[in-house]
Each structure stands twice: as C-alpha cells, then as structure tokens.
Regions:
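Polybasic/polar functional segments that serve as interface/processing modules
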Residues: 1-138
Length: 138
C-alpha cells in the first residue's frame, strides 16, 4: 500500500449518496429508478452504453433492486433494500463529465418523487489516483 501523501492527481471522481425513507408511490420501484437514472444521464449529456435493473423478490436476496446505467466514462448505479427504505446511489466518471452534476440531477428527481426522503450522506472520492503529471487529463 502506498502513502496517500505522495498522490497528487486523479483521473476520476466517484459520488456516493445514501438515503433513508425511500418509498416512492410507484408500482415497480426498480423500473422507476432505472428510468430516473437514464433520464438524468441523458439530461447531463453523458453517453449511455447499457442499462439494466434486477429486482430481488426476497427469496435469495433481501427484497429490493440493483440498477445500473453503464456510461462511456464508467457508471451510475442504485441499490435498494425496499423493506428498510434504504437507497444507495453512486455516480462514477473518469472523463470530462462531473459526477456531481449527475448526483445533483438524480437527487432533485428523487426528492420530487419521494415524500420524506432523507439524504444521510453525500461523499465525493477521487479515483484513479496517481502522481504522474503527464498522465493527468483533468
């Protein structure tokens, strides 16, 4: 493991959002959130590569879903424990787009669609850390 004090640059950022009280009044939460993620990606003018949602019925995994939108710069995902009202979102980009913009758009849509939704944590982490100035593209 290296000493982080030597790392000066990064080539990507990862935004994490953690919510409670995620209980939108929709029939299929997984389909709804996947549509919300895809719309947010499009509004931020990020290129979508693939999208998928897997709904968990509680038999092998706790009830909820995992949704992913692969983008040309990495991904945007959502994971939900529906019985607990927990929702985790992450947006990771390693190109010209700012994942904070994606997170802001997603957050606004979630708040508009989910009464009592509460953001518990928002964290931004630099990714692809390096100390080679010649490799920095940001």
């Amino acid at each position: 493991m290296t000493d982080d004090s030597d790392v000066r640059l990064s080539h990507g950022r990862h935004v994490y959002l953690d919510y409670i009280n995620f209980n939108p009044e929709v029939e299929d939460m997984g389909t709804w959130i996947l549509s919300l993620l895809r719309t947010s990606v499009k509004e931020c003018e990020v290129k979508e590569v693939h999208a998928h949602c897997e709904v968990f019925d509680g038999v092998e995994s706790p009830p909820g879903f995992a949704a992913v939108v692969l983008i040309d710069e990495s991904h945007v995902t959502a994971h939900c424990y529906s019985e607990r009202g927990w929702l985790a979102i992450d947006a990771f980009t390693c190109g010209t787009h700012d994942p904070n913009d994606l997170a802001d758009v997603i957050h606004a849509k979630l708040v508009a669609g989910c009464e009592n939704l509460k953001l518990m944590n928002r964290n931004v982490v630099k990714r692809f850390l390096h100390d080679d100035i010649s490799q920095n593209k940001e």
